[in-house]
Amino acid sequence: MKSFFTIILVSTITLVQAQFSNEVADSLQKILEAALPPGHVNPGAVMNIYVPGEYNWSGAAGYSVSGTTTGIAAKTAVNTDQFRVGSLTKLMVATSVLLLEETGQLSITDDISLYLRSSLINDTIQSSTGVTIEQLLNHTSGIANAAANQTCQQDALSDLTRFFSLEEAVNCGASQGEEFVPGSSWSYSNTNYTLLAMIIEEVTGQELKTYLQTNIFVPLNLQDTYVPESNELTEDHLGCYWQVGFPFGLVDMSIVNPSLYKGWADVVSTTEDLTRFLEALLGEQIISEVSLSKMEAPNPESSNYGLGMELYTINPDGYQGHSGEVGNTSGLFYSNLSTNLIPNGYYISYNFTYQGASSLVDVDQKVYTYLKDLEASPAGFLEGQEGAQVDVYPNPTSGIINIKTNFNEVLNINLYSTQGQLIKSEILNGKSVNYSGLDNGIYILSITSENQTFTKKITLN
């Protein structure tokens, strides 16, 4: 899917601070509030929408937790609240594996027996043929999901604070028997990422959380992203509540030993940190274009899963990232929607405090539809004068761009490459700008007046 994605990368350290108009911000807030799962006590949610190089919105709804992680949430949620990201962790672990491949420490085509002790391979996993690292990454290993083992699930729910070893987790999956011959089919399995955690630790000699911190979180300045050291989260955060059913009922999973989720769901973060991570990943600032293309290539046995990355389409634009549930519901995606207002797609990240929130219908699709429909009224996209209009022509152009407005204000004109590099900046003194002499290609034209900004994708030829 690499060819579908054009991204402006202004910064992976700080998201730009320009904001949507009040009208758009209010509409996004209403989508978030309407998505709170009904029938629950004090649900909460946070969401971030980021248009690369342009606009950034974060919102919160309902309630979160402060001071203690047990009981019903009572604090008004804010957009900086932290949360357990669930299986979004898989995207980070897969990135780490590909980073290790780039440094020559492993190959994803290697058999896992090169890195794991023989008794674990032969006595516990007992696959009918060899299993590769790549098959762990894309869930074609045939090793069963530990979460599907009812005995192990009840043991975990009975005492969420007890320590779980990686080998226990592997046994919970493998003891169910091989689901299929490795490479012959597809089945989502948390056990695959437990094994990847073991391989990363074997190769690096570091704990997984240390490797993530050193190679991803710190370089990207993700100050609110970490693997917790203790069962409780000390900062303000969203809780985790799962209606499991008999005999447990509603389970408060806010306090949990992080070892239960190691390798597949143990990271804690915020919506803006997650957006920074995905922007950096897709912008090839963590791994190379070659490695990224491997992540984005769906396995033939699954039409929508690559290497630790979910790959969807929404009407018909690409939509890639990952979802997650650990007593809550999370999502982190990039849409390559391309309109005059959103020429380079957008990022969305969110978390809801209850597992099973209808996020695909109530969040992902509704946000996409709303942002796409903004094309019908571009002046409402940003704060500005009512009825403001900007015409840019001809487009494509050989160099001269005419700019016509229905208001009288000084205009600052900035031309960017599709990678976010400023090419030319000037104040419009007449009715046109001249870009003759620049290389042929696609550029982003940003037109800013006193209180509004318009963007337009232009083609020079």
Predicted segment positions?
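Short active-site loop at a secondary-structure junction
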Residues: 39-43, 68-135, 180-189, 262-263, ...
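Residue-level signal for well-ordered, solvent-exposed loop/turn and beta-edge residues enriched
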Residues: 54-55, 105, 341, 345-346, ...
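Short, conserved phosphate/pyrophosphate- and ester-handling motifs at nucleotide-, phospho-/glycolipid
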Residues: 90, 270, 395
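Short, surface-exposed loop or secondary-structure junction motifs
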Residues: 54-55, 63-67, 123-325
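C-terminal outer-membrane/trafficking sorting elements
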Residues: 384-461
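Bacterial Sec-dependent N-terminal signal peptides
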Residues: 1-23, 381-382, 395, 421, ...
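Catalytic loop of the DD-peptidase/beta-lactamase superfamily, centered on the K-T-G motif
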Residues: 19-63, 80, 114, 213, ...
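A short, polar/charged loop-to-alpha-helix boundary motif
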Residues: 65-77, 359-366, 433-437
